[in-house]
Design a protein with these regions (language model features):
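Peri-catalytic and regulatory segments of divalent metal-dependent proteins
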Residues: 3-15, 38-170, 174-186, 239, ...
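Extracytoplasmic and endomembrane cell-envelope/extracellular-matrix remodeling and assembly machinery
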Residues: 229, 242-298
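Short, small/polar residue-rich loop motifs at catalytic or cofactor-binding pockets
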Residues: 160, 222, 283
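Hydrophobic membrane-insertion alpha-helices, especially the h-region
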Residues: 23-37
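Metalloprotease/metallohydrolase-associated module, dominated by Zn2+-dependent proteases
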Residues: 61, 199-248, 263
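Post-HEXXH active-site segment of zinc metalloproteases
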Residues: 178-210, 247-250
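Membrane interfacial helix-start segments of signal peptides and signal-anchor transmembrane helices
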Residues: 15-23
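Generic alpha-helical structural context detector
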Residues: 96, 164, 189-192, 196, ...
Length: 298
C-alpha cells in the first residue's frame, strides 16, 4: 500500500468502487419500487380514455372523507354566505342542473372510448356553499363538496360562464384528479428519498426536483386542467347552459388573475391562449352535447 508523506492512507480504488456500487444499488432499488408502484396502480379512465395513476389502496370512500375533512376546515376558516340569500340559491340552482347531467355526460364520453363509465360519483354527497371573499375562485372536492367565492361573480358575469367554471371544478372531482396528484406525490417522495439515500447533495437534489417539476409534474397538472375544461364544458352544455360563454370567461379570468392567484387558478393552469384555442376546438362537440342532452327548447 502506498503511504503519503503525512501518513494518510490513499483510498484504495476497490473501496471507491464498492461505495459507488452501493449508491447505484440504492438508486436501482428505489427505481424498481417506483416502477412497481407506477405500473401496479395504473388504470384507464373511461371518461378521458387516458391511463392514470391512482393508488389502489386509496378507496373512493377514503378520498371522500379526505374531501369532507378539507371542506369542513375551509368552511370553518372562511365566511360562508347565508344559504337562503339569492346568490346562494342561484349558485345551488346552477350546481343542481350540472349534477343532474353527470351520469349522461360520463356515459357519453366513456362511450367515445368504447368503455363503460365508473359511476363512482354515485356515492357523492353533493353540497355547494358560497364563500364571502374577493378571490375569483371555486372548487369541488372529492365526494362532491363545492364552494364558489363571491369574487368569482363579477368575473363570471352571467350564469352560463358560472356554469362553465363550476363544471370545470366538478370535472376535477369526477376524474379523481386529487387522488392522481396524491399518487404523483408518492412517486416524487420515492425519488427524493432515493436522492437523499444515495448521497446526492441537497443542491443536486434540488436540481433534479426542479427538473422533474418542469418536465413532469407541471405538464401533468396542466393536463388535468385541459381535461377538466373539456368535461366541464360538456357538462355545462348538457345542462342547457351556453358553452360559448367559456371563451370570454377565460379571457376575463386571465385579466383578473394578475398578481394574486388562488390555488386553483395558479400556474398549473394552461397558458390562456392555449386554453382558449382548446375551448374553441371543443365548441362543435359542446354544441352537439347541448343538442343531445338539453331537453329545454333553445
Ligand atoms: Zn382546474
Amino acid at each position: 500500500m502506498r503511504q503519503d508523506p503525512f501518513g494518510r492512507q490513499q483510498p484504495s480504488p476497490g473501496r471507491g468502487r464498492r461505495v459507488g456500487g452501493l449508491r447505484i444499488g440504492i438508486l436501482l432499488l428505489f427505481a424498481a419500487y417506483g416502477a412497481y408502484y407506477y405500473f401496479s396502480n395504473r388504470t384507464e379512465d373511461p371518461v378521458t380514455g387516458q391511463k392514470v395513476l391512482i393508488d389502489r389502496s386509496l378507496s373512493v370512500d377514503d378520498e371522500k372523507s379526505l374531501g369532507l375533512q378539507a371542506y369542513q376546515e375551509i368552511l370553518s376558516q372562511e365566511r360562508p354566505v347565508d344559504p337562503s340569500l339569492p346568490i346562494s340559491q342561484e349558485i345551488r340552482g346552477i350546481a343542481d342542473r350540472l349534477i343532474a347531467k353527470v351520469d349522461d355526460v360520463e356515459a357519453a364520453l366513456a362511450a367515445e372510448h368504447g368503455m363503460q363509465p365508473t359511476r363512482f360519483s354515485q356515492t357523492f354527497e353533493w353540497e355547494v356553499n358560497v364563500i364571502d371573499s374577493d378571490q375569483a375562485n371555486a372548487f369541488c372536492l372529492p365526494g362532491g363538496k363545492m364552494a364558489v367565492y363571491t369574487g368569482l361573480v363579477p368575473v363570471a358575469q352571467n350564469e352560463n360562464a358560472m356554469a362553465v367554471v363550476m363544471g370545470h371544478e366538478i370535472a376535477h372531482a369526477l376524474l379523481r384528479h386529487g387522488a392522481q396528484r396524491m399518487a404523483q406525490q408518492r412517486l416524487t417522495q420515492v425519488g427524493q428519498m432515493a436522492g437523499a439515500m444515495s448521497g446526492m447533495d441537497p443542491q443536486q437534489q434540488q436540481m433534479v426536483m426542479a427538473a422533474m417539476g418542469y418536465g413532469y409534474l407541471l405538464p401533468y397538472a396542466r393536463k388535468h386542467e385541459t381535461e377538466a375544461d373539456e368535461v366541464g364544458l360538456m357538462l355545462a352544455a348538457a345542462a342547457c347552459f351556453d358553452p360559448r360563454e367559456a371563451v370570454p370567461l377565460w379571457e376575463r379570468m386571465g385579466q383578473s388573475g394578475g398578481g394574486e392567484s388562488a390555488p386553483e387558478f395558479s400556474s398549473t393552469h394552461p397558458n390562456p391562449g392555449t386554453r382558449i384555442q382548446n375551448l374553441q376546438a371543443l365548441m362543435p362537440k359542446a354544441l352537439e352535447y347541448r343538442e343531445r342532452f338539453c331537453e329545454q327548447a333553445m
